[in-house]
UniProtKB/Swiss-Prot annotation:
Listed InterPro entries: Aldolase_TIM, OMPdecase_AS, OMPdecase_type-2, OMPdeCOase_dom, RibuloseP-bd_barrel
Disulfide bonds: none
Lineage: Bacteria, Pseudomonadati, Pseudomonadota, Betaproteobacteria, Rhodocyclales
Gene Ontology molecular function: any one: orotidine-5'-phosphate decarboxylase activity
The enzyme's E.C. designation: 4.1.1.23
Name by which UniProt lists this protein: Orotidine 5'-phosphate decarboxylase
Active site annotation, chain numbering: 95
Catalysed reactions, as listed in the record: orotidine 5'-phosphate + H(+) = UMP + CO2
Keywords: Decarboxylase, Lyase, Pyrimidine biosynthesis
Length: 270
């Protein structure tokens, strides 16, 4: 299934704009999982199973797996999501950016090895560094645009021919790079004015919006700035506030409660 088709169906069928980020930190796992060789998979799978009916997507961050030699557990996790929660797209948060020949290998890694439905990509090196991902027309390619971190303004607010760099990225992606209709953009919840600007430049293109929860982004401002006329168009990510809502053996139930609260808070402004 095309990533965008799956995403739109998830928005409607699950009545949700919530994306749960899977950033597993074993130091924060409950005691009963500590020291287990499969702890990362078990923790993430429990979160997934507890929240899948409340989300429009899951977003595993590859560094949290690779740093602990747990890429095999990431493969197993994505297989688990596809097998047990079909229709919930998986975004591999990798933020790759390299020359074409290397990007080809990163695309194979994301879409053929891990079988992700979408990947986050850094557009800084230009179109030829993104083409290998775009060559998979049924997969989502979500490009960094206006990121949620404070230092994003160092480059993203630079003037380039009368517009800010993040605006140029948004316009390029919407007008030139999205021939297969499989592109999206990353725009941080910490900057609602920029969310509104990107929405104006890109029409109904999906926006992946990190920065609520632990990073302090405002849900009401985010939704009002970025929603489409139909009340969709957003994947609003929350990671730590959901993953670590509980510390005991009932951590998955606590994560579900946090996800439900977040989803409903988002829906209040759709």
């Amino acid at each position: 299934m095309h990533f965008m088709t799956a995403l739109r169906a998830a928005w409607q069928q699950r009545d949700s704009l919530l994306c749960v980020g899977l950033d597993p930190d074993p130091a924060r796992f409950p005691a009963h999982l500590q020291g287990r060789p499969d702890a990362i998979f078990e923790f993430c799978a429990a979160i997934v199973d507890a929240t899948a009916d409340l989300v429009c997507s899951f977003k595993p961050q590859i560094a949290y797996f690779a740093a602990r030699r747990a890429e095999d557990q990431l493969e197993a996790l994505i297989d688990h999501i596809h097998a047990h929660h079909p229709g919930v797209p998986v975004i591999l948060d990798a933020k790759r950016g390299d020359i074409g020949s290397t990007a080809e290998q990163y695309a194979v890694e994301a879409f053929e090895r891990f079988k992700a439905d979408a990947i986050t990509v850094n557009p800084y090196m230009g179109r030829d560094s993104v083409d290998p991902y775009l060559a998979y027309p049924d997969k989502g390619v979500i490009l960094l645009c206006r990121t949620s971190n404070p230092g994003g303004s160092d480059l993203q607010f630079l003037d380039v021919g009368g517009e800010k760099l993040y605006e140029r990225v948004a316009r390029l992606v919407a007008e030139d790079w999205n021939a297969s209709g499989n592109c999206g953009l990353v725009v941080g919840a910490t900057f609602p004015a920029e969310i509104a600007r990107v929405r104006a430049l890109t029409g109904e293109m999906p926006l992946l919006v990190p920065g609520i929860g632990a990073q302090g982004g405002d849900i009401e401002a985010t939704v009002k700035a970025g929603r489409t006329a139909a009340g969709g168009g957003l994947m609003i990510n929350s990671s730590r506030a959901i993953l670590y809502a509980g510390k005991g053996e009932d951590f998955a139930a606590a994560a579900r409660a946090a996800a439900l609260q977040t989803r409903d808070a988002i829906n209040a402004y759709r």
